[in-house]
Design a protein with these regions (language model features):
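Conserved beta-strand positions in repeat-built beta-propeller and related beta-rich domains
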Residues: 13-19, 53-60, 96-102, 140-146
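A short loop-to-beta-strand structural motif that recurs across blades of beta-propeller domains
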Residues: 22-25, 61-65, 104-108, 149-152
Length: 176
């Protein structure tokens, strides 16, 4: 059940398998496939500029930094054991941004210090941030708990939010 995939600059494909609780690596040229057991429900994935592969875990309150060579994962716990993360994004300063869907918050992990800071999403604890993208170091995400969904922009420099209702009625935005 591969869920999210990302190509690494070295040409290998890394992926999450949410139901199986595994991370995988495929070398397209040789067909070599490596899979490892990991924390519960690995979901979103992003490759950082330094080559680290960041993983969001939807079954725990953790983020993971996967070493592409050793396939070892360093875990970072986010506040509140009930937190769940589906998607994440990376800014040019190396920060890891995530939507905390069960707590209605967005957060930032500093991988150098392990420090985590969270901000409440504009629509509150039931807003359920889901998809997340970083554009020009500004965080964009949706609040999937709202009807209709809301699109939210967060500027890390000013710590200001803007949001817009998405009137399509088409359901939940799951990826950006």
């Amino acid at each position: 059940d591969p869920h999210t995939a990302a190509f690494h600059p070295d040409g290998r494909l890394y992926f999450t398998t949410q139901g199986a609780g595994m991370l995988g690596r495929l070398h397209p040229e040789t067909g070599e496939l490596t899979e490892i057991q990991t924390e519960s429900r690995p979901y979103g994935m992003q490759v950082a500029a330094n080559g680290t592969i960041w993983v969001a875990y939807n079954g725990t309150n953790k983020l993971g930094a996967l070493d592409p060579e050793t396939m070892e994962v360093r875990y970072y716990e986010v506040p509140n054991g009930a937190s769940r993360i589906r998607r994440l994004g990376l800014t040019s300063d190396g920060m890891v941004w995530y939507g905390n869907s069960t707590q209605g918050r967005i957060g930032r992990l500093n991988p150098q210090t392990g420090e985590i800071k969270e901000w409440p999403s504009p629509s509150g604890p039931e807003s359920r941030p889901y998809a997340l993208a970083v554009v020009d170091d500004v965080i964009w995400y949706n609040e999937s708990g709202m009807r209709p969904d809301a699109l939210v922009r967060f500027d890390p420099e000013t710590e200001q939010f803007q949001s817009w209702a998405i009137p399509s009625g088409a359901g939940i935005i799951r990826n950006m």
